[in-house]
């Protein structure tokens, strides 16, 4: 069975949080570990640290990007996407700016896409309008980033690209570029397929405010690197409902604590299907909705928040431990990233050479 290639990645703009974990990291961990009936790994997974793309709206803050790359590498190590043990399943993690072929591919692709087509991308369109509304302007690099993403995908001839619903137009544009190039020159490039999560709740995790998508900039995120004290404080800030008495019926809708219980239940079903909370949670919900009787402990908000803290902390404890281990072996991890980046460079340069040959740009050495 021929392995399929997966390309995914993150913009290094800060530490990763639970939104990243449930929205993409779990999927990556599963993909890199998946084996076929012959016990062979099914996928070669490439994870790109998209530092060049991060600069499209952070050009004045390049030091922020540099620092965030280091944080991102530690986060990847802490969840098992990077390993110093060659016998363990892991992904190929590389830094975008070190793959020079990507910039050259982007330049060629720009000649195959019209301005109006790029501006039809809903993400580009909405961001452009938002910047205008704020009295600012959008860098051309931001407008052109879907073409850069097409270069990333095609350089590694990715069969699958995990994306959220909002990134589907990017896959569509990539395949349009592939078709245009193959029809204009020679069939060198490969069409790709979007791999989307089936659970909308996981792909757009709400923050601790229960209202907006989890984000560092909105100050509503639970980071994978949060200490127990930080986590405890954030869980205690979560809203429940407006009941004034324990005996009054509570509501689940808009209740951030129960929202996170439901999210964490997805993790439990994946990795701890016999966890006691999976059995107890329906009872807690029923008592909460019906109103606690005789001051039942598990109908109290404080009890529920304590249990939620314990559950999220159970997820984060091994991640924190691996992160500390990563700090102690950071030089070896950086060497691993350098090795992976060189490997990625070879693949991208091979694709670039094929593309230039198809275009007639494979000039002899003068």
PLM regions: where:
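N-terminal Rossmann-like or analogous alpha/beta NTP/dinucleotide-binding catalytic cores
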Residues: 2-150, 268, 314, 320, ...
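Eukaryotic N-terminal low-complexity, Ser/Thr- and Lys/Arg-rich leader segments
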Residues: 1-2, 366
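Conserved nucleotide- and phosphate/pyrophosphate-binding catalytic cores
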Residues: 20, 169, 175-366
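Structured ligand/cofactor/substrate-binding pocket environments in proteins
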Residues: 16-25, 44-46, 51, 60-72, ...
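Short coil/turn segments at secondary-structure junctions
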Residues: 12, 56, 60, 161, ...
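A short secondary-structure junction signal
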Residues: 120-123, 158, 216-217
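Functionally constrained cores in energy, signaling, and assembly domains
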Residues: 10, 28, 45, 75, ...
